[in-house]
C-alpha cells in the first residue's frame, strides 16, 4: 500500500467476503432475459436453491465449500447447468455478491413400456411424473401397470427436504391398488396352489371333491355344491375345486419420515439415516373373476377327487375373505460407499422392524425383522478394459471389486402366508425362479460377487449365492412351500454381463442350481446390491 523511507513495503490484504447470494435464472443459451428484455422467471423457488448453499452472507469466500455446494445442487437433478459469477462491490472493497446462474431442466416426464414378470405376466406400463411440483422440489408420480394376471396403480409423493428443517428430514407417502399373482403359491416345476370355490371342514382326515362318484355314495355322483354334499354326508369334508391361480387384491397406502443423523447441520455428511413410518392395507384373495377365494389346494395333491384336509390352505389370515394390515416400521441405514451407482469400496448396513397390529379378528399381529450388510473390496485383477491399462500420466479408469452381502430376516407371531419370506429370483438366489427356493418364517442369504469392466458400456460379473429358510417352511400357515416341494436351501453359481443404460445397469445372467446342469437365465434392472 505504501513504501516507508526505509524502503519497507506495506501491503494491506483484504479477505474476500460474501456480501449476499443471489439466484438468476438463465435460458439454455445462457441469457438472463427473454426477447423482450424481461428477466427469465424460473419455476424453482429461490429457497430450494439457496438452502443447498452453505456459504451465507457475511462468510469468507471459500472455493472448496462452493464446489461442494454446487455438487449438492446438481444432486437435486433439477438443473442442467449452474454458472457461478462473483460480482465485486466497489463501495465495499473485498466484498462480492455470489450470483448463481441456474438453467432448469425439464422435470415433467411421461414414459411407458412393455415387460414381463412372474406375478403379472406380460404387462404394459405408463408413468407420469413431476420431480419439481410447484417449484418446491416435490416429486409426484403416478404409475399404472396392466398385465395378463393383474395390474398396479401407484400414486407417490416425496418431499426430499421438508421446508425449514435443519436436519434435512424428508417425507414419502403412497397410495396403491394392485392385483397380482403371489409367487408364494406358485412353483416352476411342482404345480401351483389353486383356488377352491367353497370348502367345508367337518374334521375328517380327507376332503372330497363335489360332483364325483365315491364308494360311500353307492357310486352315484354326490351333489355339485358343498352345501348340498354336506347335507347328505355331514361326516365328510367337502371342497369345490375351481382351479384358478390365486391372486391378491391390495388397497392401501403408507408414509414415512426419513432423516440423516447430521446433528442439525444440513451440510454435514451423515452416513447414518433413520426412518419411521406407518402402513395400512386391505388384502383380499380372489380368483380371476374377482370373487373372494380364501381357500386353496395344491393341484398335485388331489388324487381321484380326494385330498388330505391338512393340504388345503388358508390363503388369508383366519381364512377370512379379507385381512386388514396395519403396521409401524422403523429402520436405520449406514452408507459409506465411495460411489452410489457402482461402488468399489465401503459398506452398507440396514436393519428394520415392522410391527403389524391387529385391529379386529381378521387382522393379524406379528413382527418382521430384517437386516443386511454389504462390503466392497477394491481389486485390480483383470485388465480387459482399456481404462485398466492407462498410458503414462493417465489416470486409471478400472472400477472392479469383490462384493460380499449377507441378509437375514425372521417373522414373529401369526403371519398370513402371503407375508412369508421368499427365497429365489433375480435379487435373491439367482439359480431359482422368484420364490421358488423357499417360503419361510426366517431366511438367510449370502452372496459373493466379482465385478469388472469389459469394453465400452459392458461389464462382467461372476457370483455365488447361497440361501436357507432355516427349516421354517413348516412354520408358515398352510405350509405352501412344502406343499410345492420347494427345496428350502440351495447354492447358485453363475456369471453375467452388465450393460450401462440411461435407466441404470441392465443385467443378463445365467445361474445354476446346486452345481448341477439345471440352470436359468435372468434379466434384471440394476445391480443385485
Language-model features: where?
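Sec-exported N-terminal periplasmic low-complexity segments
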Residues: 7, 12-53, 108
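Interfacial loop/beta elements and low-complexity acidic/Ser/Thr-rich segments
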Residues: 1, 10, 286-290
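Gram-negative/organellar outer-membrane beta-barrel architecture
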Residues: 39-47, 59-339, 348-349, 423-426, ...
